[in-house]
């Protein structure tokens, strides 16, 4: 016969072998439960374990009148009224543990309702409409972006805008509205495009002027060895041909030309 290792069977077997004296709580509980008389003013022996093979009875759900007296009204409404609502107990669990019900508190519907009202006034709950919950997965998508979205122009729109810019760099408001309506754009988009295009045009103009000035400075200018410009180069050559000969060269030529007798 296989041996059973269930905790309930072992606990119930020990409870049946060793009967507890009357007026004492049961020997063991499946979970740590405070004595029932501390919450409802019942005697310690009010709750007891049933026979083997049955589940244990919760000590908070059975009253002394149901066990040892005539049937009366159910204790579940009293149990619900003795504690604060579920929402407040869920939100203030640590506070609920600290302020437990004392053994000497009077029981009854009026006392329980007064205790619940006092608890709610002592610990007011915030308005749940003030909170805005955002899921973790979609937090990056739902947050507002500070950057402005760039407009993706089509090739046809860019061609028409460039053509209009070549004819007129500054548009009037009426012309801007006409272009925006024709290209299926907003007036603000057309205005921003023309502003950016003018800035780009100015940058391109400054760059071309700078490159042109640097090329003229490097390639232009007359050579330092020549004292005359290119326009008077012919005059300079004529002046060089008419320069007088030096005295030494003239005397040498005279000596060579003398004839001996």
Curated annotation (Swiss-Prot):
Keywords: Activator, Developmental protein, DNA-binding, Homeobox, Nucleus, Transcription, Transcription regulation
InterPro entries: GSH1/2 (IPR042191), HD (IPR001356), HD_metazoa (IPR020479), Homeobox_CS (IPR017970), Homeodomain-like_sf (IPR009057)
Keyword Nucleus (UniProt): yes
One GO MF term: DNA-binding transcription activator activity, RNA polymerase II-specific
GO cellular component: nucleus
Pfam families: Homeodomain (PF00046)
Cellular location(s): Nucleus
Residue intervals passing through the bilayer: none
GO biological process: adenohypophysis development; hypothalamus development; neuron fate commitment; positive regulation of transcription by RNA polymerase II; spinal cord association neuron differentiation; transcription by RNA polymerase II
Region (Disordered): 201-261
Record's compositionally biased regions (Gly residues): 210-223
Domain of life: Eukaryota
Function: Probable transcription factor that binds to the DNA sequence 5'-GC[TA][AC]ATTA[GA]-3'. Activates the transcription of the GHRH gene. Plays an important role in pituitary development.
Name the record gives this protein: GS homeobox 1
Species of origin: Mus musculus
Gene: Gsx1
């Amino acid at each position: 016969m296989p041996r059973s290792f269930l905790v309930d069977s072992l606990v119930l077997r020990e409870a049946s072998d060793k009967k507890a004296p009357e007026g004492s709580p049961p020997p063991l509980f499946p979970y740590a439960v405070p004595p029932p008389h501390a919450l409802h003013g019942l005697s310690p022996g009010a709750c007891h374990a049933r026979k083997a093979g049955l589940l244990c009875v919760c000590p908070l759900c059975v009253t002394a009148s149901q066990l040892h007296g005539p049937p009366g009204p159910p204790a579940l409404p009293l149990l619900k009224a003795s504690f604060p609502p579920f929402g407040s107990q869920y939100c203030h669990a640590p506070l609920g543990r600290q302020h437990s019900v004392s053994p000497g508190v009077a029981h009854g519907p009026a006392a329980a309702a007064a205790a619940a009202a006092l608890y709610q006034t002592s610990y007011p709950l915030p308005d749940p409409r003030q909170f805005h919950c955002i899921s973790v997965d979609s937090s990056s998508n739902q947050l507002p972006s500070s950057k402005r979205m760039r407009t993706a122009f089509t090739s046809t729109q860019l061609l028409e805008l460039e053509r209009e810019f070549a004819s007129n760099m500054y548009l009037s408001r009426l012309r801007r509205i006409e272009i925006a309506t024709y290209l299926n754009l907003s007036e603000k988009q057309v205005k921003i495009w023309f502003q950016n295009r003018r800035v780009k045009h100015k940058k391109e103009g400054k760059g071309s002027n700078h490159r042109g000035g640097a090329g003229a400075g490097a390639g232009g200018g007359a050579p330092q060895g020549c004292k005359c410009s290119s326009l008077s180069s012919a005059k300079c050559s004529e002046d060089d041909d008419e320069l007088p000969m030096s005295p030494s060269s003239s005397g040498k030529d005279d000596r060579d030309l003398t004839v001996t007798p």
